[in-house]
Amino acid sequence: MHRSVPRDGFTLPAVALSPYGTGVLYAIGAGVALGTLGPVSNIAYAAGMGSPTFAAMRATIGALVLLAFAGRAERRVSLRSLSRREQGTFALTAAAQACLSLALFAAYGAMTVALVLAVYFSYPVLVAGASVALGRERLTATRVTSLGVALAGLLVIVLGRMGPDAHVSLPGLALAAVAACCQATYLVASRNGFTRVPSTQAVTVILAGAALAIWAVALPVDGVSGRLTAWVAEPSAWLAILFAGAVGAGLAKVWLLKGVRRVGGTRSSVLMLAEPLTGVLLAAFLLGQPIGLPELLGGAGVLVGAILAQRPAAATAARVTAAA
């Protein structure tokens, strides 16, 4: 008989799954939701929005949407009741989220997108290494295989989408590497950093803190270029940023935290490789970008890696963090 999982807003529909199985779905769902950001951001940029403003608006809208749900659908925990370590982890996670958004969007402007993704999506390896070093997970043969197969599939997709005009830049490589480190930090720190705080409330705090930090960059950068408000009269930009905030920030980050708390950082990071697959499919549907043999073969590799990653060890399946 499976234990019930606490409901605290933005939960998946009730299904006959164990808490571990539900965590697998949450991690995949988070990857799919985050995968919408690439095509959606292109719509906003085409309407005149700058990338720092997009990142700041996304975090702000996500925090506001979650604030409404957190107040109605779940218990709250006073942040003052948290230990200094837990409060420090909150601050670290918010800083990682802000740095991730700024570094990734800046990398896209400095180097070919395919190369940025090839570097950025190395973060599952960083998560696995950190989790093993901290004694949270064991580096089993299945886990190594799932990482290798999934990352090889991703590399096939990325290299298959590189054109003859692809260019490498040291700033672009550095920014993409920083983004990967920030994502790994987010996943590792949030795993056990503040488990008493429900997921929706925790992500609300993280996004709010990240929004403040990103606005500190967006206001001067896009204010000077004129892209801070150039988009406000465009309905397409509003639709894009509202979707990115509600789904690509609020929903995605809550599901991500729920997944990490249930199945761990390494498995979640591999399952979240659904993100680039979603981006490729949406780019084909919304932007008319074709899907070729590399995308099909690479997608198969990512799926095989995800299937291997979601297989739980007996001890892991039985031990799920209570504060989901």
Please place each PLM-identified region on the residue numbering:
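Glycine-/small-residue-enriched transmembrane alpha-helix faces in small-molecule transporters
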Residues: 2-57, 95, 103, 165-192, ...
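Hydrophobic transmembrane alpha-helices of multi-pass small-molecule transport proteins
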Residues: 66, 139-161, 282, 294-313
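Membrane-interface helix termini and inter-helical loops of multi-pass transporters
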Residues: 39-51, 78-79, 158-169, 220-236, ...
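Helix-helix packing/entry segments at the starts of transmembrane helices
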Residues: 31, 57, 116-122, 189-212, ...
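Specific transmembrane alpha-helical segments of multi-pass solute transporters/efflux pumps
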Residues: 33-38, 70-116, 120, 156, ...
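Hydrophobic/small/kink-forming positions within alpha-helical transmembrane segments
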Residues: 35, 39, 60, 94-102, ...
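Hydrophobic alpha-helical transmembrane segments of multi-pass integral membrane proteins
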Residues: 21-26, 53-72, 146-152, 171-178, ...
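Specific alpha-helical transmembrane segments that line the substrate/conduction pathway
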Residues: 53-64, 97, 104-138, 143, ...
